[in-house]
Design a protein with these regions (language model features):
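Acidic/histidine-rich, metal-coordinating catalytic segments
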Residues: 165, 238-248
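Short, surface-exposed basic-aromatic patches at helix termini and helix-loop junctions that form
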Residues: 253-262
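An anionic, glycine-rich sequence signature occurring as long contiguous blocks
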Residues: 2-6, 10-32, 262-370, 374
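Hydrophobic "anchor" residues on beta-strands that sit immediately upstream
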Residues: 161, 240, 262
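A short, flexible helix-boundary coil/loop motif
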Residues: 395-416
Length: 416
């Protein structure tokens, strides 16, 4: 029996090679083909607003006053080199070699008054000349910029809350300062451990630094807390520090008390003893109890206040099979303990600490801004690049604050 095959029913094999109308790449990585880009950036895509922001706050004057220039003398000047890196980060490119995509852009070239931007290697060599001194000066520049923006926005916070947290940046290769430490995503890999502090009210970066990939010691935490006072705006009179258990030590508590800060720090390693008869339940429908006590851990000079929250564990329904009963009452609960010098009910203090959870979102935004990118093998270059990235992050925050202020003012005028 002969079967006739329908015309066009045979499967055709896909040809090898490149297609003329291949879809554009959605991500830029090491294998992406690149050349000089012929497309232009939209003036309404954020870059024009950034240029106007520089003019509004007088960024050039602040830069020349606060920035400590390195020994390398670029042809365009230190301000143009730093502004170019900030613009690259603001656009969304977070690697120095991404300058090849915007080298001929009319808006960037017009801002710097050149026919084309320098090669990407020029910016990399300039970054290679930066070090710890330049990072400190960039942080000072950020402090002056904060004062200027707060003045423009009419912000006068007498009390602020500062959230302190660390993150992990996994590195690949022989990077200076990389260590094996707490890294949940890439266990056993080398990494760096940046330390960051954010202001809760404005969600901006206040102070931080790039660190080796090891746990924060008590002396380092104390030095970091003592340095916060040097970066506070002039209107601030009271500060509440909130940190996780990595920062709990007598050195850090002593530094916070010496600076006059209120603090709520999660417990790590301390075993305070609470009065069994002092547990109270502020909400009847929630199986949550609170307590507080004064306790002096070993090695501490005096006692501090500890507040606790215990949550009843889920009990399995009784079965016909014999089961092991719980020997101690503490095994029936999950405990959350904090060290603080704040007065008030224990549940109010823990509710205040729980508002710190938003710092994880801020750290994630900073990492997407470019904090995850390590441009050099040298630690001093990466240390300076860390502060530049966080300065770009703050500029993005300030532009949103100014835009919100202008929108609110326009709504008030229309309502009146």
């Amino acid at each position: 029996m002969v079967k006739q095959r329908k015309k066009g029913s045979r499967k055709r094999r896909g040809g090898k090679g490149s297609y003329a109308h291949r879809a554009r790449a959605r991500r830029i990585n090491a294998s992406t083909e690149f050349e000089t880009c012929s497309e232009q950036l939209s003036p309404f895509g954020g870059l024009l607003a950034l240029i106007k922001f520089f003019d509004l706050v007088g960024f050039r004057e602040i830069f020349h006053f606060a920035y400590q220039a390195p020994c390398r003398q670029p042809k365009l000047g230190h301000y143009s080199m730093m502004a170019g890196i900030l613009m690259l980060l603001f656009i969304g490119f977070n690697r120095i070699w991404h300058f090849v995509y915007v080298r001929l852009d009319a808006m960037l070239c017009g801002f710097f008054r050149v026919s084309r931007l320098p090669a990407a290697s020029t910016y990399w060599r300039y970054l290679d000349s930066l070090g710890i001194n330049q990072a400190t000066s960039v942080l000072k520049l950020a402090d002056m910029l904060r004062e200027r923006v707060w003045q423009l926005c009419g912000l006068q916070y007498a009390r602020i809350r500062i959230n302190i947290d660390t993150t992990v940046k996994t590195v690949f290769g022989n990077q200076q300062g990389a260590r094996k430490g707490h890294n949940t995503q890439h266990r056993g890999k080398l990494g760096l451990r940046p330390l960051l502090g954010f202001i809760e009210e404005t969600r901006e970066y206040l102070v931080g630094k790039l660190r080796k990939g090891v746990t924060v010691s008590g002396q380092e935490a104390a030095a970091f807390i003592a340095d916060i006072q040097n970066h506070l705006p002039g209107c601030v009179r009271e500060v509440l520090l909130r940190a996780d258990g990595e920062f709990l030590s007598w050195e850090s508590v002593q530094a916070a008390l010496a600076a006059g800060f209120d603090f709520i720090i999660a417990n790590r390693g301390c075993t305070p003893v609470f009065d069994p008869g002092s547990w109270y339940r502020p909400w009847r429908r929630r199986a949550v109890e609170f307590n507080s006590c004064f306790y002096r851990p070993g090695g501490w000079d005096h006692a501090c206040r500890f507040v606790a929250m215990r949550i009843a564990k889920e009990q399995k329904p009784p079965s016909t099979q014999p089961h092991q009963c719980v020997l101690f009452e503490d095994d029936k609960y999950t405990y959350r303990i904090f060290c603080t010098n704040v007065a008030g009910a224990a549940h109010h203090i823990i509710v205040e600490y729980d508002k710190r959870a938003d710092v994880e979102n801020l750290v994630g935004e900073a990492k997407r801004e470019g904090l995850d990118m390590i441009p050099s093998v040298k630690f001093k270059n990466n240390y300076a690049f860390f502060q530049i990235v966080m300065l770009a992050y703050n500029i993005w925050r300030y532009m949103k604050m100014l835009a919100q202020k202008s929108v609110s003012a326009a709504q008030k005028r229309s309502a009146s």
